[in-house]
């Protein structure tokens, strides 16, 4: 179990970034497998424990960076969820958990998954849309680990992974973009059609098809036969296109001065101000409308605090448990979390000033 203070330090690092409204968030993942072991689906529990011990030992030897090894079987559910939320990791940790672990750095930007889909996944998050710098950090860590570990590699297929499409560079690059105006105007699908063979689209929650808070997640479909630089360059081009279209859509909404939009924004403020219970969908959708209103200068925060960026994470149940519950009595029980979520949004909504 990770001490609460360390977990709090890790999860609050994102609050220090005063990101612009449109700035995307990116995550990068490099998958690796030990050359001396079978792929994860073929491993026994004992073999998985051996892989975990081998890899974890190397992280403890890395100088200049403090890492925490967290076996999943010993990690409370709420801490697992909190870490996955913070790093925007698309993994389901409800399996056997034996021989599986997360390894996180003190800075709150790097995470390694052991025996999840592959023996090792090096994962990082970038809050200021500088994925090239994040990639270099992951590559440096990968090179350091390869000094002691031999990863499965083929001259023809690159790094070998459980999923054949993820061979090659074995890089998955994701961009999370807030696109409320495009969704409202039903313009998003036509923008994405030319890129559907190269990038997959999903929501904030990888196992859900529901759009949460008007967040679009783009990720490359294949890493075989393309370099890391090519993947990031293509992702930047698509994201830039979407951001330009979102800006244009917001300007049109502002010009139209739509009563319907204003009504949705005002109803969202009312919901966050007066609700006793809020599920995640309701809370993020309402927050998205409010953030849209703030970007159009129809709403102002009396304390000049950013709203969307912290709330993007802080309304999810792992973060709610961390920040709002007694250390000895943490729970992610649905009704309790819904009540805490409503209590969290109320003071945020009450300090908003209407300019419409």
From Swiss-Prot:
Q: Which InterPro entries match?
A: Arg_Kinase, ATP-guanido_PTrfase_cat, Gln_synth/guanido_kin_cat_dom
GO-annotated molecular function:
ATP binding; phosphotransferase activity, nitrogenous group as acceptor; protein kinase activity
Where is ATP annotated to bind?
A: 25-29, 172-176, 202-207
Every Phosphagen kinase C-terminal domain range: 22-249
Does the record carry Ubl conjugation as a key word? Answer: no
Q: Which UniProt keywords apply?
A: ATP-binding, Kinase, Nucleotide-binding, Transferase
Q: Which Pfam families match?
A: ATP-gua_Ptrans
Q: Which reaction does it catalyse?
A: L-arginyl-[protein] + ATP = N(omega)-phospho-L-arginyl-[protein] + ADP + H(+)
Lineage: superkingdom: Bacteria
Asked whether the keyword Coiled coil is assigned, the reply is no
EC assignment: the record states: 2.7.14.1
Q: What does this protein do?
A: Catalyzes the specific phosphorylation of arginine residues in proteins.
Family designation: Belongs to the ATP:guanido phosphotransferase family.
Name of the protein described by the UniProt record: Protein-arginine kinase
The organism's lineage is: Bacteria, Pseudomonadati, Chlamydiota, Chlamydiia, Chlamydiales
């Amino acid at each position: 179990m990770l001490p609460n203070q360390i977990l709090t330090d890790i999860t609050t690092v994102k609050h220090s970034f005063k990101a612009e409204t449109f700035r995307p968030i990116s995550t990068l993942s490099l998958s690796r497998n030990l050359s001396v072991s079978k792929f994860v689906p073929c491993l026994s529990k004992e073999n998985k424990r051996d892989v975990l011990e081998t890899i974890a030992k190397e992280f403890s030897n890395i100088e200049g960076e403090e890492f925490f090894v967290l076996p999943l079987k010993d990690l409370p559910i709420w801490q697992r969820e909190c870490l996955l939320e913070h790093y925007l990791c698309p993994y389901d940790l409800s399996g056997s958990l034996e021989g599986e672990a997360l390894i996180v750095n003190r800075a709150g930007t790097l995470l390694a998954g052991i025996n999840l889909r592959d023996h090792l996944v090096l994962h990082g998050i970038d809050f200021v849309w500088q994925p090239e710098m994040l990639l270099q950090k992951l590559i440096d860590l990968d090179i350091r680990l390869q000094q002691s570990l031999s990863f499965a590699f083929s001259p023809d297929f690159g790094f070998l992974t459980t999923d054949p499409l993820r061979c090659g560079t074995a890089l998955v690059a994701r961009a999370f973009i807030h696109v409320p105006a495009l969704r409202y105007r039903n313009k998003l699908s036509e923008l994405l059609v030319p890129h559907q063979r190269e990038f997959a689209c999903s929501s904030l929650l990888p196992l859900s098809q529901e759009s949460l808070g008007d967040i679009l997640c783009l990720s490359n479909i294949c890493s075989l036969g393309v370099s890391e630089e090519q993947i990031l360059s293509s992702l930047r081009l698509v994201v830039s296109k979407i951001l330009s279209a979102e800006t244009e859509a917001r300007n049109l909404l502002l010009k139209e001065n739509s009563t319907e939009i204003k009504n949705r924004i005002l109803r969202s403020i009312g919901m966050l101000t007066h609700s006793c219970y809020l599920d995640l969908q309701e809370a993020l959708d309402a927050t998205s409308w409010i953030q849209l209103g703030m970007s159009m200068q129809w709403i102002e925060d009396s304390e000049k605090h950013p709203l969307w960026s912290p709330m993007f994470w802080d309304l999810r149940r792992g973060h709610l448990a961390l920040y709002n519950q007694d250390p000895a009595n943490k729970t992610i029980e649905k009704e309790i979390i819904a009540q805490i979520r409503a209590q969290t949004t109320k003071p945020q909504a009450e300090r908003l000033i209407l300019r419409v």
